[in-house]
């Protein structure tokens, strides 16, 4: 399905490129102040580790570097709750490594969005995601205090939070999790 087919805003331009080849898209980045990156394979267990790393780490870091070379000053990146370059858990280690690579580029503002469970409108990954899509709405109210960072968020709400956050003033490196997503959506913080 083509998620962009209904977008009619005259300010939008559509370019079909290989996201793993910065040479195909870098010229389109010039003149933009902010870049949003949600590149990733999603369910890491469905792909070989090399492919996951090629997309989620190298592809994302290459996009960030291309943005920086073209003068983008604000980079907003979707990673994952618990992202940590030193983690023994492969998925969160890769997410932590990409955060470190983005930080090293020296953007005036780098915002890392770390959701736990992304609630998608459809099940794209099979049985496991189907279970999580069913259970998380029931479990979310039990995740309080420090556990609230593991609450789910819909893709739509996360997208709104990212855009609203980009529109607010800020600088440096920022990490946003569930609590901060909610504050941005309410217009009260982050």
Which positions does each model-derived feature cover?
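A generic "cationic amphipathic patch" detector
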Residues: 8, 27, 45-48, 80, ...
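Short amphipathic alpha-helical segments at helix-loop
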Residues: 44-48, 82-83, 143-146
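NAD(P)H-binding glycine-rich loop region in Rossmannoid oxidoreductase-like domains
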Residues: 4-62, 66-69
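SDR active-site strand-loop-helix element
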Residues: 38-39, 75-81, 113-115
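Oxidoreductase cofactor-interface core, primarily capturing Rossmann-like NAD(P)-dependent enzymes
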Residues: 3, 70, 85-188
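Hydrophobic, well-structured mid-protein blocks that either form specific transmembrane helices
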Residues: 51-98
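Short beta-to-alpha linker loops that shape the active-site pocket of alpha/beta-hydrolase fold enzymes
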Residues: 1, 20, 81, 116
């Amino acid at each position: 399905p083509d998620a962009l087919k209904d977008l009619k805003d005259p300010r939008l331009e559509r370019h079909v490129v290989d996201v793993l080849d910065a040479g195909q898209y870098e010229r389109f980045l010039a003149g933009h102040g902010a870049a949003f990156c949600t590149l990733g394979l999603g369910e890491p267990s469905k792909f070989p580790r090399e492919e996951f790393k090629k997309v989620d780490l190298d592809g994302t870091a290459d996009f960030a570097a291309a943005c920086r070379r073209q003068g983008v000053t604000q980079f907003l990146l979707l990673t994952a709750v618990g992202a940590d370059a030193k983690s023994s858990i492969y998925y969160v280690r890769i997410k932590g490594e990409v955060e470190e690579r983005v930080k090293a580029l020296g953007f005036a503002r780098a915002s890392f969005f770390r959701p736990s469970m992304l609630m998608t409108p459809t099940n794209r990954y099979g049985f496991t995601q189907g279970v999580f899509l069913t259970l998380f709405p029931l479990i979310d109210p039990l995740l309080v205090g420090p556990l609230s960072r593991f609450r789910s968020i819909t893709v739509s709400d996360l997208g709104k939070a990212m855009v609203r956050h980009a529109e607010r003033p800020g600088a440096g490196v920022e990490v946003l999790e569930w609590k901060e997503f909610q504050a941005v959506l309410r217009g009260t913080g982050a």
